[in-house]
Amino acid sequence: MFETSSEKPAPVRVVTEAIKEYLDRLGPIWIEGEISELNERSGGMAFIRLRDTSADMSLSVMCYKTVLASVQPLPPNARVVIHAKASWYTKSGTLTMSAKEIRQVGVGELLA
């Protein structure tokens, strides 16, 4: 990592590149949550809002519809584990989670 101060701040490019390097080293991870939103788009992509099962936190995950098809049909608020890889786009400072596998583990407790 690098050291910064008000006298020696890090340029945006250095910070965004450091975030990208860290996330690239992290590799794919398994994430558990409840699907609170599911939007299937034309073009083969789907976007999932994954909500924590015990805290008021959520995360956006994108996947190909073929990945989603392996667990269809999903009941409302399905509880799932998702194998995903985080990617950081340095130009825009955007974090994207891309699902490679989804497994249903039960029906969640989220009430709409």
Language-model-detected regions and their locations in the chain:
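Acidic, two-metal ion nucleic-acid-processing modules in DNA metabolism proteins
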Residues: M1-A112
